[in-house]
Amino acid sequence: MGIQILPPQLANQIAAGEVVERPASVVKELVENSLDAGASRIDIEIDKGGSKLIKIRDNGSGIPKEELALALSRHATSKLHSLDDLEAILSFGFRGEALASISSVSRLTLTSRTAEQSEAWQAYAEGVEMAVKVMPAAHPVGSTIEVVDLFFNTPARRRFLKSDKTEFTHIDEWLKRIALVRGDIHFTLTHNGKTVRNYRPAMNEPQYLQRLTQVAGRPFADEALRVECQHDDLRLSGYLQSPWSTVLTDTHYFYVNGRLVRDRLVNHAVRQAFAQKAEVEQPGYVLMLDIDPHQVDVNVHPAKHEVRFHQSRYVHDYILQALQSALEEAGELRFEPHSPQIDDSSPYVKPETESSAFELQSTESNAKYLGIDTTGERQAEARVVEYRSSDMPKMRTGTAVQSNAFGSMSVPRETRSGSSGESRPRAELPSKTAIASYGALLQTPSYSVQDKAYQPTLPMPSILDGQFWVFTDGPKLSLLRIESVALATRSDEIETKLATGLIGQPLLMPVSVAADTDWSSLLDEHATLIRQLGLELTIRYQQLIIKKVPPYLRDCQLARVIPEWLQSLRFEAPAPNALAIWLAEQSLTGFISAPDVWVAYCQLTEEKRQQIASKAVSLPWQSWLEEQAIE
């Protein structure tokens, strides 16, 4: 048999073997064409699982009369015209094979009208040569494509179709995926005359969360963590399954420039990000990556299910770091009791009068110094925690990105209804009794460093640059760093309490980190010391579970601080003084109130005050005056 050109019908049927696998493949190709045409509403009508009828109607730009015949021809497309267009493609379709392939294995009718035309036109192909006939029709601006009797002329393919229910399930599942990434489009899905899905346009965050609930289910949507991250030409957005959730989900959707793809790269990045945090083996996610189209090749799979990144390692590390940062931010959002907020704009406050300098206030700044975290209002209200990046590495082929921050991301705490009055649940909500007991524990007065009625007999020195106290002793002028005084008074307080043991505060959400193999023996060996610090640590399934911590560690990154402390125990057990200094350093990470530090300083013994005062730095002001006089 000699070489010859295949007839159009045969060539199209061969191509249909790759493009048209089942009715869901037809729906995918036609809906993507509607999206490329700029449609804002797409109605999908299915009969008998798609084997009898597939009808797609949109309000897009339509097809001009003179191009209808070309639309049903092979390798005819309006999406690109040159190789440069292919290398920067953003549309769903670009090969020009879908309509020709579908029409070769079905009875296809295409009706369309543009805004410039006064009437619509209808086209269909028939015969061995697939000649296209065009005739007038009635139709609004947009297009309607009817695919009747799919695989009617290829009985073998038709026999391999599953039941109507199974085939429709594939169509429904694909529509769910496209509905997530195109929240601005109104989709309807009808099967056997009954409306099954109605995805209304999601023009704001609450509406999109409703769509996410429709598609992914309420267990995923209620606990999902939002991700927003951007750096240069890369932007990652979407939702992650909560690391505290134990619900199994099949929500694993990844989009590149709006195109749903299957990619091992992102699956690996998600698993790696959740490695030390998630209780489920494969967490759910809905992630959308926007990237420069020149940096990704979408023309590598017959059905366009896969893509190839030009710098895959860079993209992998970008996604990994973005997800890790989002999870770390989420881990810091802990429930805390309600208290009023104050403006902590200035690091230190100098009182206007001597008496007002020593009035202790129950504010957030004082609580920071006393080791009590009373910033509950920040957690009780829905909020967004932003994570900002600074210097970012440039793209380098084959080089892993070492930065731990790739942009800004947010983890909203709002409820699905849009209310900002209560926090979103992460797993099981605690009982009201537990919450009340927890809040009462955090406000236990025994954690105060001093009696609130105590009034110092010495006036507080003047403050220089918000960081130093200025002391005068005759002709001597010296500066004492307030932070060092706070550290000394706090460590003295902690060392005193260590003798009887610190009282641990239960975490509403225990923190879990991967455990080293010898940590179990470390916990047994130093069990007394751990209880003395008010810590409650257990190991389960190679995970270290942190259940209780002393008040001085509540503002710390527990997933980092506790493992580092356990590592130090491998060498030697620290002395009480060293433990007190370590706890004091961990607790003094935020705002420090100068009046409170002065109150604590005045309550120390004379000997300890002298030890602290010896750290003051003398200022050679006499020499400076002499130099000024000479000049």
Swiss-Prot record:
CDD domains: HATPase_MutL-MLH-PMS-like (cd16926), MutL_Trans_MutL (cd03482). GO terms for biological process: mismatch repair. The lineage of its organism: Bacteria, Pseudomonadati, Pseudomonadota, Gammaproteobacteria, Alteromonadales. It comes from Shewanella oneidensis (strain ATCC 700550 / JCM 31522 / CIP 106686 / LMG 19005 / NCIMB 14063 / MR-1). Gene3D superfamilies: 3.30.230.10, Histidine kinase-like ATPase, C-terminal domain, MutL, C-terminal domain, regulatory subdomain. One of its GO terms (molecular function) is mismatched DNA binding. The gene is mutL. Belongs to the DNA mismatch repair MutL/HexB family. This is DNA mismatch repair protein MutL. The keyword DNA repair applies.
